[in-house]
From Swiss-Prot:
Tissue: Red blood cells.
A GO cellular component annotation in the UniProt record: hemoglobin complex
GO biological process, alphabetically ordered: hydrogen peroxide catabolic process
Keywords, ordered alphabetically: Heme, Iron, Metal-binding, Oxygen transport, Transport
Protein name: Hemoglobin subunit beta-2
Gene Ontology MF annotations: haptoglobin binding; heme binding; metal ion binding; organic acid binding; oxygen binding; oxygen carrier activity; peroxidase activity
Domain Globin: 2-145
Binding-site positions, heme b: 63, 91
Homology family: Belongs to the globin family.
Domain of life: Eukaryota
UniProt-listed PROSITE patterns: GLOBIN (PS01033)
Length: 145
């Protein structure tokens, strides 16, 4: 993914303020609530029976934080996302995750970021994040044949 210097500035300005646990937990919870079929990948997470249960599930929050930290690392290396090959292979061969869910998750993260950063999250900032997350989703989806 090629980002302009301005797009990188937009992303860094927001990302430097992100609370991984809060934003990651909210994003994964939102994914599981809005796209309930994604819950099948998290059968070991316990109670996912309602929006409230999902939003307060410690495993959802912890995994959301983990995923967001991984995205944070990817944002530092958008020019070379080949390091995500093993993660891609794991999601493809072991977990059988539909690669469209990576795109969905990126979209959900954008929504949560917009909620948290209101005025700062301009259309230009959103466009930069959409572009970057698209590259990350593509890299993680590369392990699919």
């Amino acid at each position: 993914v090629h980002l302009t210097d301005q797009e990188i500035k937009y992303i860094n300005a927001i990302w430097s303020k992100v609370d991984y646990k809060q934003v990651g937990g909210e994003a994964l919870a939102r994914l599981l609530i809005v796209y309930p079929w994604t819950q099948r990948y998290f059968s070991t997470f316990g109670n996912l029976a309602s929006a409230d249960a999902i939003s307060h599930n410690s495993k959802v929050i912890a995994h959301g934080e983990k995923v967001l930290r991984s995205i944070g690392e990817a944002l530092k290396h958008l020019d070379n996302l080949k390091g995500y090959a093993k993660l891609s292979q794991y999601h493809s061969e072991k977990l059988h995750v539909d690669p469209a869910n990576f795109v969905r998750f990126g979209g959900v993260v954008v929504i949560v970021l917009a909620h948290h950063f209101h005025e700062e999250f301009t259309p230009e900032v959103q466009a930069a994040f959409e572009k970057a997350f698209g590259g990350v989703a593509d890299a993680v989806g590369k392990g699919y044949h």
